[in-house]
Amino acid sequence: ADNKFENSLRREIACGQCRDKVKCDPYFYHCG
C-alpha cells in the first residue's frame, strides 16, 4: 500500500513538472 501511494504521488509530481509529454518518462506518460 505504501509503495502504491508513493508511486501515485511521484506520478502526480512528475505530471505537474512535465511540460512536454514527449520528454516524460514512459512511467509518467499516462497520468490523470
UniProtKB/Swiss-Prot annotation:
Signal sequence coordinates: none
Cellular component terms per the entry's GO annotation: extracellular region
Statement: the UniProt record of this protein carries the keyword DNA-binding: no
Tissue: Expressed by the venom gland.
Keyword Lipid biosynthesis: no
Gene3D superfamilies the UniProt entry points to: 1.10.60.50
Domain of life: Eukaryota
Localization: Secreted
Record PTM: Contains 2 disulfide bonds.
Disulfide bonds: C15-C31, C18-C24
One GO molecular-function entry: sodium channel regulator activity
Keywords on record: Disulfide bond, Ion channel impairing toxin, Neurotoxin, Secreted, Toxin, Voltage-gated sodium channel impairing toxin
Family: Belongs to the scoloptoxin-03 family.
Name of the protein described by the UniProt record: Mu-scoloptoxin(03)-Ssm3a
Biological source species: Scolopendra mutilans
